[in-house]
């Protein structure tokens, strides 16, 4: 997996994702095998994402390494791998939980995030990420610092629970 570092203020949409992919210099991407300049578009898959505007289906680009044959999805940093809930929403839910606030209020800006989604985010945080953040003194906000710290210490996006290799590409938009 390759995560593109994007600014927090960019709204997550198919058109924004397509812009990121179309402006990407593929020869600058590095495969998990360590080689650069060998990744080519391999295909696409669809995944559901829940945003401020409701749910939508995002068509995600996959690339393949011509050297080792591994494939990688390319995701913006605003998405948590293997989750429908965006990073900003996850962090708000966790922040509200940590502060003793009504956890459902965090979802008011996300019409398709329900109570089960909230419970899942909190459960994943407590099981996989709470002690990691404490041990490295990592804070939830600002998101850009959180992303950098999690990749630096754990080679993973915050709230990523599958131990799939994930490389951060410093693309800024």
PLM regions and their residue ranges:
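Long C-terminal interaction/binding lobes of large macromolecular proteins
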Residues: 1-12, 26, 131-173
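Acidic-enriched, low-complexity/disordered segments with a strong bias for Aspartate over Glutamate
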Residues: 7, 18, 53, 96, ...
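Context-gated lysine
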Residues: 48-50, 119, 127-130, 162, ...
């Amino acid at each position: 997996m390759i995560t593109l570092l994007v600014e927090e203020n960019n709204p997550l949409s198919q058109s924004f994702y397509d812009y990121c992919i179309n402006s990407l210099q593929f020869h600058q991407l590095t495969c998990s095998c360590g080689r650069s300049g060998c990744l080519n578009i391999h295909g696409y898959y669809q995944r559901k994402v829940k945003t401020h505007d409701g749910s939508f289906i995002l068509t995600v680009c996959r690339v393949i390494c011509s050297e080792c044959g591994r494939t990688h999805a390319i995701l913006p940093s605003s998405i948590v791998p293997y989750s429908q809930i965006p990073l900003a929403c996850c962090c708000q839910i966790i922040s509200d939980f940590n502060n003793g606030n009504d956890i459902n209020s965090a979802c008011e800006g996300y019409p398709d995030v329900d109570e089960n989604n909230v419970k899942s985010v909190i459960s994943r945080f407590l099981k996989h990420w709470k002690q990691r953040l404490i041990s490295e003194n990592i804070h939830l906000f600002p998101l850009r610092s959180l992303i950098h710290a999690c990749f630096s210490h754990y080679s993973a996006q915050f709230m990523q629970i599958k131990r799939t290799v994930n490389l951060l590409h410093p693309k800024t938009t």
